[in-house]
């Protein structure tokens, strides 16, 4: 039983489907992405891609309404790097253009559907349309395909897009032509190099799944606006009218099976903590397949007694469907190996598109804080035949964590910059933010860029709240008794209060925001070559450093009485010397060590960086907080939770995925969730 057997099944399915011509799918189920040229902002989040690569998609330009310069695949925000092409494929005056290669189609696009591709093999770049080579030039370069249909802030495409395929290989002209009008399958000769695949039939106004996406950054589409204060129409989907693209709708076949893990820790005594999802991507509706078995390994769970029960559910075709249908008989006693089968029942009938299967744990009330929780999908069965999923991406292990009502000497603190009030994910971003707050179950939430969500979040969670106004930058939420006797001096930068833990320990807490370096804005553009870290340090010494010194010396230290502790956290808009070391320079484009002054000040003032205290090796845990949604900057940690006094950090995690596995992230910053314990005297 090997992974290759899945591929064998799929190839046989393709051959079987070749006996009779495929019938075009119902146009109501085959959909395309529509952009209106105004303020659509559809992001993939994909980062830097060195040659070889291929960009491939179907386009239908609105010739009557299009602008002079429109992007098809580009970099999006913060993508302007001198050595990178962030406008890979565009329309300039209606003509297909690869700017960096100086390639332009001879004719303007009409209003018909066209298959277009840009291919770089490491030596040359070629522009193709409808199976014809339009132009070629001897050159090679790195691209940043972070958006579909929009540039850094403008250049929105006017028209429709379908079947976006991004490859880490140079797809041959023959293969491009042969597969242009066909749905992809694992029999494609470059299938192993498929980096992103958006059929777009599942686009729901908020997101569309990257069928090959894996890990904490699966590059699912995120639908939003650039002008966040405005309300221009979002990109949307409509039934396809592309007669040249014939989706597969014959005997059902499996495209792939991907395991997506959660990184969220599980509270002691909690039920149905999400551990993983098996994402089954299926094509075709004739003779649908059934999931009839699942084999799980719990070998990497530290102690099986921490797990009270294991559950498996079918959760529908959307990550956020809300559906949970028990599979394989409901609850199961944990074991190192769990072989689950339908036991004569029909099993889960798979639907065309994405199908999710969720594995959850009930955590024992007496589970040990810090113990590892883990499950592997060893195999799954379709109609009684056994296959293995694709190897999962590396993720941070889940652990048992505290439960507020049970552990009075623990303090759980969530810090998060939610990005402009949480409005950057379609029209549902604020609801996604609140769902994360509920799931985190933090005692204290230190929020930045709250901008209007304050009252909505307080009502939804039941938290006490302190904010200068409902439209202000900073907000502080807590489930604990709170004294707001500390006055505001600079409410845009500092929001202090005092909370009393369940054990009686009093803590000064502060949600803060510091000014950022902008000459240059190194936290966003550190992938640039030829950077000068001394200049970054100088800028921070003029902005972030005086801000943090002012806030600590005036809004925290004067209110620390004997026996009290302090927890301060927020968006420092500056990196840490603890991360940017010589050993970790490979994560930061060769830069390091860098003596960032704000983090050095906190260390010298006696404050402990909770994440780096718990994870002292910066090469083993290099995660960043800015930005989760931009693949070119994965290791910029600029958000921190620091402590001082009797509180000691015992757990800390960068939260970079939603509690609901495989759902889109609503912000740009990751969150930081740290657990502290009052030290014994």
Placement of each model-derived feature along the sequence:
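Flexible glycan-contacting loops in extracellular carbohydrate-active proteins
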Residues: 28, 134-160, 185-195
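Active-site regions of metal-assisted phosphoester/phosphodiester hydrolases
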Residues: 401-435, 439, 476-681
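Extracytoplasmic low-complexity segments
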Residues: 22-38, 177-240
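Aromatic-rich beta-strand patches that line glycan-recognition/binding surfaces
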Residues: 34, 55-56, 66-82, 177-183, ...
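Short surface loop/edge beta-strand patches of beta-sandwich-type extracellular domains
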Residues: 34-53, 101-107, 152, 180-189
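Extracellular glycan-interaction surfaces
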Residues: 26-37, 56-65, 82-141, 224-238
């Amino acid at each position: 039983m090997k992974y290759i057997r899945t591929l064998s099944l799929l190839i046989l399915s393709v051959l079987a489907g070749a006996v009779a011509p495929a019938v075009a799918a119902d146009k109501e189920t085959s959909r395309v992405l529509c952009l209106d040229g105004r303020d659509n902002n559809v992001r993939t989040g994909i980062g830097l891609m060195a040659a070889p690569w291929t960009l491939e998609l179907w386009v239908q330009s609105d010739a009557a309404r299009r602008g002079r310069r429109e992007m098809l695949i580009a970099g999006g925000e913060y993508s302007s790097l001198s050595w990178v092409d962030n406008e890979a494929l565009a329309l300039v005056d209606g003509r297909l253009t690869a700017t960096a290669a100086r390639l332009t189609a001879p004719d303007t696009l009409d209003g018909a559907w066209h298959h277009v591709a840009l291919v770089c093999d490491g030596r040359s770049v070629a522009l193709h349309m409808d199976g014809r080579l339009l132009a070629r030039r001897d050159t090679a370069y790195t691209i940043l395909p972070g958006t579909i249909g929009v540039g850094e802030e403008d250049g929105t495409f006017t028209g429709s897009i379908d079947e976006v395929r991004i490859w880490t290989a140079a797809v041959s002209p023959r293969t491009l032509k042969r597969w242009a009008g066909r749905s992809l399958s694992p029999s494609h000769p470059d299938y192993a190099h498929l980096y992103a695949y958006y059929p777009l039939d599942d686009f729901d106004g908020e997101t569309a799944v990257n069928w090959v996406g894996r890990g904490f950054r699966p590059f699912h589409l995120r639908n939003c606006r650039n002008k966040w204060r405005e309300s221009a129409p979002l990109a949307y989907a409509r039934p396809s009218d592309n007669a040249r693209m014939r989706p597969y709708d014959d005997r059902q076949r499996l495209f792939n099976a991907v395991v997506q893990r959660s990184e969220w820790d599980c509270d002691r005594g909690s039920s149905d903590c999400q551990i993983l999802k098996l994402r089954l991507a299926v094509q075709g509706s004739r003779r649908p397949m059934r999931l009839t078995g699942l084999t799980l390994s719990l070998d990497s769970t530290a102690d099986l007694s921490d797990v009270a029960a294991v559950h498996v559910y079918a959760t529908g075709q959307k990550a956020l469907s809300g559906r949970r249908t028990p599979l394989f008989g409901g609850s199961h006693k944990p074991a190192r190996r769990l072989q689950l089968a339908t036991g004569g029942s029909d099993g889960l009938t798979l639907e065309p598109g994405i199908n999710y299967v969720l594995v959850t744990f009930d955590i024992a009330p007496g589970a040990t804080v810090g113990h590892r929780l883990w499950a592997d999908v060893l195999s799954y069965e379709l109609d009684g035949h056994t296959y293995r999923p694709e190897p999962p991406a590396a993720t941070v292990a889940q652990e048992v964590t505290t439960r507020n009502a049970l552990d009075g000497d623990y303090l759980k603190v969530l810090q998060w910059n939610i990005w402009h009030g949480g409005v950057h994910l379609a029209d549902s971003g604020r609801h996604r933010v609140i769902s994360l707050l509920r799931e985190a179950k933090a005692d204290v939430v230190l929020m930045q860029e709250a901008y209007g969500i304050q009252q909505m979040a307080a009502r939804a969670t039941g938290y006490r709240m302190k904010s200068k106004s409902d439209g202000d930058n900073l907000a502080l939420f807590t489930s604990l008794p709170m004294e707001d006797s500390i006055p505001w001096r600079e409410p845009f930068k500092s929001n202090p209060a005092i909370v009393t833990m369940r054990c009686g320990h009093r803590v000064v807490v502060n949600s803060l925001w510091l000014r950022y370096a902008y000459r240059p804005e190194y936290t966003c553009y550190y992938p640039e070559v030829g950077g000068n870290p001394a200049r970054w340090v100088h800028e921070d010494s003029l902005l972030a450093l005086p801000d943090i010194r002012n806030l600590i010396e005036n809004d925290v230290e004067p209110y620390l009485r004997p026996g009290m502790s302090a927890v301060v956290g927020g968006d420092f808009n500056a990196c840490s010397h603890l991360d940017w070391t010589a050993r970790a320079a490979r994560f930061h484009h060769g830069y390091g060590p860098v003596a960032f002054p704000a983090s050095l000040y906190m260390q010298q003032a006696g404050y402990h960086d909770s994440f780096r205290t718990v994870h002292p090796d910066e090469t083993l845990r290099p995660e960043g907080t800015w930005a989760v949604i931009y693949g070119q900057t994965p290791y910029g940690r600029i958000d921190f939770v620091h402590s001082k006094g009797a509180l000691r950090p015992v757990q800390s995690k960068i939260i970079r995925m939603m509690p609901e596995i495989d759902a889109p992230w609503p912000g740009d910053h990751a969150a930081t969730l740290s657990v502290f314990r009052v030290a014994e005297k």
